[in-house]
Curated annotation (Swiss-Prot):
Reactions accelerated catalytically: L-homoserine + acetyl-CoA = O-acetyl-L-homoserine + CoA
UniProt source species: Desulfitobacterium hafniense (strain DSM 10664 / DCB-2)
Protein name as catalogued: Homoserine O-acetyltransferase
Active site positions, chain numbering: C142 (acyl-thioester intermediate), H235 (proton acceptor), E237
Record-marked site positions (Important for substrate specificity): S192
Database matches in NCBIfam families: metA
Pathway(s) annotated for this protein in UniProt: Amino-acid biosynthesis; L-methionine biosynthesis via de novo pathway; O-acetyl-L-homoserine from L-homoserine: step 1/1
Function: Transfers an acetyl group from acetyl-CoA to L-homoserine, forming acetyl-L-homoserine.
Single GO cellular component term: cytoplasm
Gene: metAA
Main subcellular location: cytoplasm
EC number annotated for this UniProt entry: 2.3.1.31
GO biological process terms, semicolon-separated: L-methionine biosynthetic process from homoserine via O-succinyl-L-homoserine and cystathionine
């Protein structure tokens, strides 16, 4: 089934060439089925790359999805032109009176800053609080997951001695959770971060449950009971060459960076990267969309405030 995006969105052309079913607004107006409404709060600097990665995964679902793109109005973007944001994105003030089946809050390359020093932190707090009554299920990614765990549950983040950078094996802590349905016993996920949340802090919070972790990269999937909030510390949405682009960028700036682990054959950056996470990423987003949004959300979204 298609995902509905704003007319003319550049990601639509890219994904159409990949045979992802994209439906622009004009065509979607003639559909009789109520699509799922998903709002994506895109905090990444290069919004086009991130929105394309996420839409690719949402478009692999058999469900029809209506997309709203959101950006923090209190942050001035240096990497995405303002006219692009005006054309394709909404601000919180423009959507705060709406309700959504699902929400995705992306990561941001600011994990070394204290949360309170992030210029859009007050706005993000307001959006996260709003989501509790206006969104059925929210998926938090990487820094977004750290921000959500800190804001709602007081879970701190800690600096790492070296950047967690590479593709790491993960295992399941539960097998009877719908989000994990179909996951392999061992599956791989990219990570790219300078900070971490720790198991000993999360297990102290009765509302939270660690669903998956890694001996190398730590806690990966955390959920609230019932799945209204899902926290993902890795980047399963990454394209095959995203880690390469980050590595090449840091090398060009002469920044201290290790070769991403388990990514290049023989850890040799002259080789073509090996993708080990594509199946997992599609399953994670499909399960969230199906089991935690589509099958649970009320048909009348105005009922959300009562749940």
């Amino acid at each position: 089934m298609p995902i509905n995006v704003p007319d003319g969105l550049p990601a639509a052309e890219i994904l159409t060439k990949e045979d992802v079913f994209i439906m622009e607004e004009k065509r979607a107006e003639h559909q009789d089925i109520r699509p799922l409404s998903i709002v994506i709060l895109n905090l990444m600097p290069n919004k086009i790359i991130t929105e394309t990665q996420i839409l690719r995964l949402l478009g692999n679902s058999p469900l029809q999805v209506d997309i709203t793109l959101l950006y923090p109005e209190t942050h001035r973007s240096k990497n995405t032109p303002e006219e692009y944001l005006i054309k394709y994105y909404q601000t919180f003030d423009s959507i705060k009176d709406q309700k959504f089946d699902g929400m995705i809050i992306t990561g941001a390359p600011i994990e070394q800053m204290p949360f309170e020093e992030v210029d859009f932190w007050p706005e993000l707090q307001k959006i996260m609080d709003w989501s509790k009554a206006n969104v059925f299920s929210t998926l938090f990614i990487c820094w977004g997951a750290q921000a959500g765990l800190y804001h709602f549950f007081g879970v701190p983040k800690y600096p790492l001695p070296a950047k967690m950078f590479g593709v790491f094996p993960h295992t399941l802590n539960r097998r009877d959770i719908r989000l994990l349905r179909g996951f392999d016993d061992i599956f791989y996920v990219p990570h790219s971060r300078h900070t971490e949340v720790r198991k000993e802090d999360i297990v102290k919070v009765p509302e939270l449950e660690i669903l998956s972790e890694s001996e190398e990269s730590g806690v990966y999937l955390v959920g609230t009971k019932g799945g209204r909030q899902i926290f993902v510390t890795g980047h399963s949405e990454y394209d095959p060459y995203t880690l390469k682009a980050e590595y090449d960028r840091d090398i060009s700036y002469e920044l201290p960076i290790n070769v991403p682990q388990n990514y290049y054959p023989g850890d040799d950056p002259r080789q073509t990267p090996v993708v080990r996470w594509r199946g997992h990423s599609n399953l994670l987003f499909a399960n969230w969309l199906n089991y935690y949004v589509y099958q649970e959300t009320p048909y009348n979204l105005e009922e959300l405030g009562n749940r």
